[in-house]
Amino acid sequence: MDHVEKLISDVKLSSVVPGRITGDDKLQHEFTNMDLIMKLHYIKALYFFKNEVVEGLHIHDLKLPMFNLLELYYPISGRIRRNDGGDGGGGGGRPFMKCNDSGVRVVEAKCKNKTIDEWLAMNDSDHDELVYDQLLGPDLGFSPLVFIQFTWFKCGGMSIGLSWAHILGDSFSASNFLNIWAKIMVGQQISPQFLQKSTKTNKLINNNNNNNPILSTTRKFPFSLKRVDPVGDHWKITNNIKMQSHSLHITQKQLNQLLSKVCGTYYKVKPFDVICATLWKMLAKVRGEYSSEPAIVTIIRGDHDNETTEVVSSNNQVTISTVEANDVKVSDVDTSKLTELIGEKTVDETRIVEELMEKENGVSDFIVYGANLTFVNLEEAMIYDLELRGKKPIFASYNISGVGDEGVILVLPRLEGGRIVNLVLPQKQIEGLKNKMRVELGIF
C-alpha cells in the first residue's frame, strides 16, 4: 500500500525495560500447553484518542509508566529460548521465556496528511500501518514479543497500536496490559502482577507421559486444530490464498432487529450466538457458489470472571470448542437452528488440545484461528476501559494475524452500543459477504 506508506513518516523505534532488574528467582517462565498452541498467532489492538485528550502528551509521558508496568509484567520483557537451544533460542526443544529484561519495543510515528476521522474512513486494511507488523523469528532468541506504536495525526489526535504475541496471553490479557499501563500513568497503585498459569495445564508440564493417565484420553486429533509444516524458529504461517480484513458495524438498533428476526421474542439467546449463526449461514451461501460449505466451525471464548481483570493471565482462560452442522445444509437451515447449535451443542476440545501439545512435548506446530472458520467472543473484553486523562478512546478494535485459510471472525463491543465484527477471510468471500449483509440485513 504505497499510498499509506507515504502517510506514515518519522518512524522511530526504541526499547523500554523493567524499572528494576528481575530477580534470579524469576529468570525462567514456563509456557503452558495452551500458550504454545497459540504461538503462530498474533493479537493486534488499535485505539484512537482525540486531540483534546492527548494534547501536551509527549513520548516521555507515555513511556515512563512502562518501566513500572514491566516490573509487574516482567516475563513480557523476556525472550524465547528452547530447553536445548542456548542463548540464541535455537534448537528443537520446548520453548520457554528467559526473563532477561530485554524489553518491549516502542514505535513513534506521524501521519501528517490525515486526521483521525479521515483515517477511520479509509479501508480497514490500512489500519495495519498503525500497528507494528510483528513476527517472532527467525532469530527467535532476539525477537521482542510486544510492540506499542504511538501515531500522531494531523488533527493532533493519537492512535495506540499494540502488537502482542498470542503466546503471552489472549486478547483479554492484552487489554489488561494496556489498561494497567494507563492506570499507572495517572498514579494508581497496582499490586504485583505475574503471568498466571492454569493448574490444569501445569500438572501436565514436565510429567512423564507414560505415567500420566490423563494423557490417555486423547485418542483423536481435535477438529479445532490444523497441523502445519514445521516452522522452526520463524513463527509465521503461509496462506494458500489471499486474505483480507473488513469490519462490520452493527448498531444497537440493528442488533435488536437481528435478535428479533432470528429468535422472535425469545431474548434469552446471546447476541454473540446470533451474530455467529447469521454469518455462518451467509458465508455458507457465499462459499456454496464455488466450493463446499463450512460444516464445522470453531468457537473461542475467554472464560474470564471479575477476579481476572486485575491480573496478567496467560492463555489458560481460553476455551476452544467446535460446532458441527450434522445432516443439515447450513445455507438452507433456519438461522435460529444454527443459533441453538452454537449456544447448546458445542463440543469443548480445550483439554484434548492441551493434552495433544503435552504429548508432543510442546514442539509441534498448529494453528487454531482459521483451521476452521473461527468465531471469537470478545463481547466482554474491557477494551474501552483504557482511558487517557479520564477519557475513553473514540474507537477501539482488536484483530488477529497469522490466520489460516478458513478465516476468523471477532465479535467486540461497540462504544455506542451494538457490536463491531472484525473479519479476516479469503478475499473472494469478503465481497460476497458484504453484499449479502447489505442486501439482506442492511448491515455494512
Feature names for model-found ranges:
Residues K12-K26, K39-P75, R79-N372, V376-E380:
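Soluble acyl-CoA-dependent acyltransferase catalytic core bearing the H(X)4D motif
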Residues L36, L145-T151, D405-P413:
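Short, surface-exposed beta-strand/loop micro-motifs that present aromatic residues
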Residues M1-V11:
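PEST-like, low-complexity acidic/proline-rich intrinsically disordered segments
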Residues D2, M38-K39:
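Position-driven detector of the extreme protein N-terminus
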Residues H29-M34:
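Detector for long, low-complexity, acidic/polar
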Residues V368-F444:
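Low-complexity, glycine/alanine/valine/leucine- and proline-rich hydrophobic stretches
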